[in-house]
Amino acid sequence: MSDMRLIVAGAGGRMGRALTRAISETKGVVLTGALEAPGSELLGQDAGVLAGLPANGVKLSADLWTLSAGADGILDFTVPAATIANVAIAAQRGIVHVIGTTGLSSSDNAVIKSVTDQAIVVKSGNMSLGVNLLAALTRRVAQSLDAGFDIEIVEMHHRAKIDAPSGTALLLGEAAAAGRKVDLDDHSARGRDGVTGARKTGDIGFASLRGGTVTGDHSVIFAGPYERIELAHKAEDRMIFAHGALKAAQWAHGKSPGLYSMMDVLGLAEF
């Protein structure tokens, strides 16, 4: 079987460079395209060199339609507007679209869902094995404990992260809500400030911290009467997300059109 031909979107960014390095380390995949935003000063540069590798001859381009001719998939950790633009082209080409972009709105998610009758999309707020196992455990614990245990999710990331709560925190919140059989949108408590009154029973709280170079720390706290359960994950290098994205792409290659998650990829959907 020939290598899976992949495009990295946002190839000049931190995650894009990590993805390029991960592809170079992984059997069965090859980098055939590197996408960057129109007007970027990085256009035309070699993706390998940008990632700290030997030159690989793949130049950064802003033309996804041309890059995607003959490709098998695209790895997309960019920004919502770019991802939504990429969704349409990936669907037209019928290639695997792995989406790790965070900060997507409900309308963005609706656009993504609308193409999955013809597109193969793997979308997750976090691509690492550890975080998805944490999400599965969160769902199980939330299911097992009654509303007497309050759920709080605390996350910390580097000072340059532009969205909050993180996509991973929301992934964990969705897992907790699923365990409680409630809608997260109706039970989410964010950004408490001032005189907020007593905590509402059944809320799922979020706290976001930003500073330094933290790759990603997440804790799910179940606080009950006189006892507390904490589940936590600390990411030490974003390469865990890059290798997870590659696992997702290879798993999805050849699958029927649809919207999948890392829970599907890792076999944790029914955990």
Swiss-Prot record:
Q: Which Gene3D superfamilies match?
A: Dihydrodipicolinate Reductase, domain 2, NAD(P)-binding Rossmann-like Domain
Active site per database record = 157 (proton donor/acceptor), 161 (proton donor)
What Enzyme Commission number does this protein have? 1.17.1.8
Where is NAD(+) annotated to bind? 10-15, 36, 100-102, 124-127
Principal place where this protein is found? cytoplasm
What are the record keywords, sorted?
Amino-acid biosynthesis, Cytoplasm, Diaminopimelate biosynthesis, Lysine biosynthesis, NAD, NADP, Oxidoreductase
Compartments, record wording:
Cytoplasm
Provide the catalytic activity annotation.
(S)-2,3,4,5-tetrahydrodipicolinate + NAD(+) + H2O = (2S,4S)-4-hydroxy-2,3,4,5-tetrahydrodipicolinate + NADH + H(+); (S)-2,3,4,5-tetrahydrodipicolinate + NADP(+) + H2O = (2S,4S)-4-hydroxy-2,3,4,5-tetrahydrodipicolinate + NADPH + H(+)
Q: Which GO terms describe its molecular function?
A: 4-hydroxy-tetrahydrodipicolinate reductase; NAD binding; NADP binding; oxidoreductase activity, acting on CH or CH2 groups, NAD or NADP as acceptor
Alphabetized PROSITE patterns for the sequence: DAPB (PS01298)
Query: Can you cite a GO biological process for this protein?
Result: diaminopimelate biosynthetic process
Residues noted as binding (S)-2,3,4,5-tetrahydrodipicolinate in the record, renumbered to the chain? 158, 167-168
Q: In which pathway does it act?
A: Amino-acid biosynthesis; L-lysine biosynthesis via DAP pathway; (S)-tetrahydrodipicolinate from L-aspartate: step 4/4
Q: Which family does it belong to?
A: Belongs to the DapB family.
**Task of the protein:** Catalyzes the conversion of 4-hydroxy-tetrahydrodipicolinate (HTPA) to tetrahydrodipicolinate.
Q: Return the NCBIfam families for the record.
A: dapB
Name of protein:
4-hydroxy-tetrahydrodipicolinate reductase
